[in-house]
């Protein structure tokens, strides 16, 4: 596997590789699914994403959520602190007010990444046990209000032109029923029509 260093001066989380002999699981190895049900698998193949309920213990999500509030120097019970000017500068200034929290390697994050149910879900998707983990940050979003609109933008967290394919996991730390809150956006059908879709995009 070759390392793509073209991005080395660009901030963010680019893909760690652009070539690989490995591909997503096509079930041809006959290996039994560990976490996904057959219904889950069919949904994954059709939509390009799948939801794993109760993937990690509630205690894991609670302690990480508490850490994020503390790291951002905000109080979950005091809305006045939610919209205060950030005390930390972000290298990618376009991410200001996007909810991204610059925390990557805390043990709480690694406990989630390595939790058996999470790991086994990825082994189902890849069809192999030896996985390479890339890391990303956490996210803490607040309701939009005048003067503090959500400034995130829909994007890929990897270069879709590269091989191998990438699969990203997202863990919701709280149940969210308000459609106006949250940082995740998904277009399920795009992975099936990407090649056609990109032909109609401006260069």
Mark where each language-model region is:
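Non-heme Fe(II)-dependent double-stranded beta-helix
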Residues: 2-46, 53-161
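Double-stranded beta-helix
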Residues: 20, 24, 176-203
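A residue-level signal for beta-strand positions that form part of recognition/binding surfaces
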Residues: 49, 166, 183
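Short hydrophobic-aromatic micro-motifs
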Residues: 51-52, 171
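Short loop/turn segments at secondary-structure transitions that flank enzyme active sites
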Residues: 58, 144-146, 173-175, 190-193
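Short C-terminal domain-edge/linker segments immediately following a structured domain
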Residues: 82-86, 143, 167-169, 199-203
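Hydrophobic side chains in beta-strands
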Residues: 140, 171-173, 186
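Short, conserved beta-strand element in jelly-roll/cupin
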Residues: 159-179
């Amino acid at each position: 596997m070759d390392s793509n260093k073209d991005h080395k001066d660009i901030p963010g989380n680019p893909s760690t590789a652009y070539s690989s002999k490995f591909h997503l699981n096509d079930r041809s190895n006959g290996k039994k699914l560990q976490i996904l049900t057959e219904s889950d698998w069919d949904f994954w193949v059709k939509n390009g994403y799948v939801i794993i309920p109760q993937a990690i213990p509630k205690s894991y999500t609670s302690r990480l959520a508490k850490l994020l509030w503390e790291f951002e120097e905000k109080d979950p019970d005091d809305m006045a602190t939610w919209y205060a000017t950030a005390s930390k500068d972000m290298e990618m200034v376009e991410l200001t007010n996007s909810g991204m929290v610059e925390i990557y390697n805390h043990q709480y994050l690694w406990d989630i990444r390595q939790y058996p149910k999470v790991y086994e879900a990825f082994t189902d998707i890849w069809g192999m046990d030896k996985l390479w983990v890339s890391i990303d940050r956490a996210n803490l979003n607040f309701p939009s209000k005048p003067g503090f609109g959500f400034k995130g933008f829909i994007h890929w967290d990897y270069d879709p032109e590269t091989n191998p394919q990438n699969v990203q996991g997202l863990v919701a730390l709280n149940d969210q029923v308000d459609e106006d809150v949250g940082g995740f956006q998904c277009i399920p059908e795009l992975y099936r029509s990407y090649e056609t879709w990109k032909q109609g995009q401006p260069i």
